Amino acid sequence: MQSVDTTKYIIYADITADGIVERPDVVGAIFGQTEGLLGSDLDLRDLQKTGRLGRIDVQISSSGGKSMGTISIPSSFDKVETAILAAALETIDRVGPCMARIHVTKIEDVRAAKRKYIIDRAKRILVEMFDENLLETEQITEEIKQSVRVEEITYIGKDNLPAGPNVLDSDAILVVEGRADVLNLLKYGIKNAVAVGGTNIPPTITELCSKKIATAFTDGDRGGELIVKELLQVADIDYVARAPEGKCVEELTQKEIIRALRQKIPVEQVMDMYKIKPFTRKKREIVTKRKSLIRERPVSVRTVAQVVPIAHHAEIAPPHEIQTRVHQKEVHEHYEEPEIEGQEPEEWFKHHVEELDGTLTARLFDRNNNPIRDVAVRDLARELKESNGSVHGVIFDGVITQRLLDIAAEKGLDYLIGAKMGSIAKTPVGIKVITSGQ
């Protein structure tokens, strides 16, 4: 009897006979008519006894005086010997007293079928049996990370607000919604975040925002928008950053967090967008706060003719975590009101101002005052940085901020026309600054 484990190929053949024959007749004809045909090495009876040939399976039926059926023979020989045996079957021309014809239809490679089974089964094993162990490893890693983050989190003020360890010592803070947001920022090395703990803004937040440069960093949903609106009315917020639409700060990746903080919007522009009454403060007080915080830092001072960039407000922990270097440049000791160009805008200015009103869109112009393209106001700073000298003027439906002025001066723009004037510490020389209300 042929062992299933040693079978390499299975020979399949069809048989037809001009008369009534049965299985024993077919098997007898196979053994009888191939005996001595291929020599002693390929004698079917001897091969079956030694296990090189399997059991000959015959399925046959009779109808209308004729018999038809199939034959299958397992073989453990290699391809050449198996092909010889298959060809020998087709030499059989008689079964019992009847004329017969045998035709080999195919030779199946059993090992190929086994290989296919092995591949399919290995895939299932990989998914089903290794998945559980992988999850356990991830859970252990996450538990360790969570433990470290929980140890770093502190609670400040009378309200016991969850905060990063650097909130009290830092001159810039991130105001987020909840404890989970603080933990996620700690995960990526941002240690100057403090949570408000809901829409009811506690006094500790108001006090911190009055002393530090504060950036509100909220979820990209309706709840985040409501918190921003309340913060603007009760706290001295300087910038607003939002998570991508539909996402929460606690679930953001490192890349998404950095992108959101880089795209923060000055508070003046946000207040204009929401059309709400802001937290009461004078323009001079805003500038004084920011300048005093800058002077408190032990940084080397170097003179810069026109550009006064604003530092990043997310403190990143060194060195194994994200590093954000803050470069500070000289700021004038005394606040000076910006000298705004007092001339009436030309007619073509007015046309573009009216066209952009209420769209929160910026229009870039070339040297000949021809429009280049329109961009969203939130992307204006990035577009100017990447302009490479092609942009010579901008008209936009937004607030003219110190950051935009600095970038415009750095890129050599001739004019900057906005809807409103924000908190400006210094107007660069050589650039016309006009508001649409002039």
UniProtKB/Swiss-Prot annotation:
Entry binding sites for Mg(2+) 2: 219, 221
Binding residue positions for Mg(2+) 1: 177, 219
A Pfam family that the UniProt record links to this protein: Toprim_4
Bridged cysteine pairs (disulfide): none
SMART domains to which the protein is assigned, alphabetical: TOPRIM
Catalytic activity: ssDNA + n NTP = ssDNA/pppN(pN)n-1 hybrid + (n-1) diphosphate
Cofactor needs: Mg(2+)
A cellular component term, taken from the record's GO annotations: cytoplasm
Enzyme Commission (EC) number: 2.7.7.101
Domain Toprim: 171-245
Cofactor note: Binds two Mg(2+) per subunit.
Broadest EC class assigned to this enzyme: transferase
GO molecular function: DNA-directed RNA polymerase activity; metal ion binding; poly(A) binding
Biological process according to GO: DNA replication, synthesis of primer
Keywords assigned: DNA replication, DNA-directed RNA polymerase, Exosome, Magnesium, Metal-binding, Nucleotidyltransferase, Primosome, Transcription, Transferase
Family: Belongs to the archaeal DnaG primase family.
Function recorded in the entry: RNA polymerase that catalyzes the synthesis of short RNA molecules used as primers for DNA polymerase during DNA replication. Also part of the exosome, which is a complex involved in RNA degradation. Acts as a poly(A)-binding protein that enhances the interaction between heteromeric, adenine-rich transcripts and the exosome.
UniProt subunit comment: Forms a ternary complex with MCM helicase and DNA. Component of the archaeal exosome complex.
Protein's name according to its UniProt entry: DNA primase DnaG
